[in-house]
Amino acid sequence: MIDYIKGNITELNPTEVILECYGIGYRILISLQTYEGLNGKSDAKVYIHHYMREDEELYYGFATKDERELFRLLIG
């Protein structure tokens, strides 16, 4: 399981960030709060919630562990 991804921000918009880590670009869905924290930065550490089912695999990213835990409580 992935706890966080740390890397260079190659793309950023209010709903997602692309983090490049060792030559791999990870597409991570983010909240507006996380977007505001990342805006203007070139590097980031994003805490990950990995969502996977038969036809879909997504990474949700959060600026803090607390934000991720709240998300997990809401979907749980």
Predicted regions and their residues:
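Conserved hydrophobic positions within beta-strands
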Residues: 7-9
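Long, highly charged, low-complexity intrinsically disordered interaction regions
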Residues: 11-76
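Short coil-to-beta-strand transition motifs
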Residues: 1-5
